[in-house]
């Protein structure tokens, strides 16, 4: 098996997945919305697998509270847009990656236009607020797009209880419950693969807030839990492409 210098970094992946699968990954275009604790890890694992085109979306900047768990967050990146920090990493990982960077808050009315702007082979939903999350899910399913979604990783710590199920089979997850309720009101009851945890959330790890956009509470998190959720999402995308 011969490799050019540019493709040498993919040798181990090709050895496992095979040449045909690698070519499918190179041709694929994956949209990742939400680049926090879960989404950034999902996006990087997808990038490292050799996906050829990606669009990443997140308006947030790196904050001190992100450093305990988020991939783009270190002291030297404080105040910088997460999407831009990750774009630098991804282009350094794969210089041939065709990357579209959108450091914007994805408002509900902008979602249909984004999904119609090009042909996405997979959509990764790692949004942590209910309204835009549900609009993305709704419009992706309406268009017949492949989509996988992350439910809540906060206030939980046991990675052995992480599962992949259909959204309508989730339990012990406040975000899942809110998403189901909103989608039902929107008339959407199609199947949706999600990663969630069967672990009951620790109520003492949740506090009410009123200073964050579209958020009513903040949940305690630990370094590894969102990362594992993100890896679950990436594995699903890579397996299904």
Where do the PLM segments sit?
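N-terminal charged helix/coil linker that caps or initiates catalytic domains
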Residues: 1-30, 64
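Glycine-rich phosphate/adenylate-binding loop
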Residues: 2-4, 118-122, 129-132, 142, ...
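Conserved N-terminal Rossmann-fold NAD(P)-binding element of oxidoreductases
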Residues: 32-34, 57
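Hydrophobic/small residue at the entry helix of a nucleotide-binding pocket
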Residues: 38
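Glycine-rich phosphate-binding loop and adjoining beta1-alpha1-beta2 segment
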Residues: 51, 56-94
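Acidic/polar active-site rim loop that often engages polyanionic ligands
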Residues: 64-72, 155-166
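Short amphipathic alpha-helix with an adjacent loop that forms part of the alpha/beta core around
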Residues: 109-120
